[in-house]
Amino acid sequence: ILGLRDEKIICSSVPPYCIPLGNKVYEWLVNEFQNSDLHVIYAFSKDYYSSVASLNEMGATWALKHKWTGVLLPGFQFNQLDGCIDKTQIAIKLDDSDNRTLKYRLSEFKDELIKEFNLRPMSEATWERQRDDFLDRISTITEARARECKDTGEADQRHVPTIGQDDVGSIPVEPAFLL
């Protein structure tokens, strides 16, 4: 991701970013939270807020004052943010109706990560292609999930889960991951 080395990314249930074999999950996470300068990326959704593990990570991030960035998955609204996070902190909404704002926020985030982790910048053409491919994948997944909800008659069609452990593939996102 943007040239960040795999060993610098933790996504607890997604290989190769997962917790190393033989480790105790919570002991390992506590060690990472206490001994690393983390940047936590939240993928906010209804599913995120139903995950005890995700809420524990949110609390640890808040208590230890680690840097974080919020990403609202499609179908999740700003007024649904809850918990100990600062709800006034600007976040990225992946189904923002203002496409210019969405692209701008993603570019801001890319630039922030490049600066924070001293990564090699990429050309604008490469970035725009990767960003637009990412947004196209988000849109495709969202549309497929909306059709599934319609076909199955799922009651809450406003919440369309889009990305998570079941949809990792080339979009490495789970409820929260740490850099």
Where does each model-flagged region fall?
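Conserved beta-strand scaffold positions in the cores of enzyme catalytic domains, especially
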Residues: 9, 68-70, 89-93
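Alpha-helical scaffold elements adjacent to nucleotide-binding pockets in ATP/GTP-utilizing enzyme cores
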Residues: 1, 56-61, 105-112
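Conserved BB-loop
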Residues: 2-31, 47-54, 114, 119
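C-terminal interaction surface of TIR/SEFIR-family domains
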Residues: 75-179
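A general structural motif
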Residues: 6, 36-37, 148-149
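Residues at the C-termini of beta-strands that transition into short coil/loop
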Residues: 13-15, 72, 95
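Short, structured coil segments at secondary-structure junctions
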Residues: 5, 57, 64, 85-88
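Conserved beta-strand-loop-alpha-helix hinge of the TIR/SEFIR fold
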Residues: 28-80
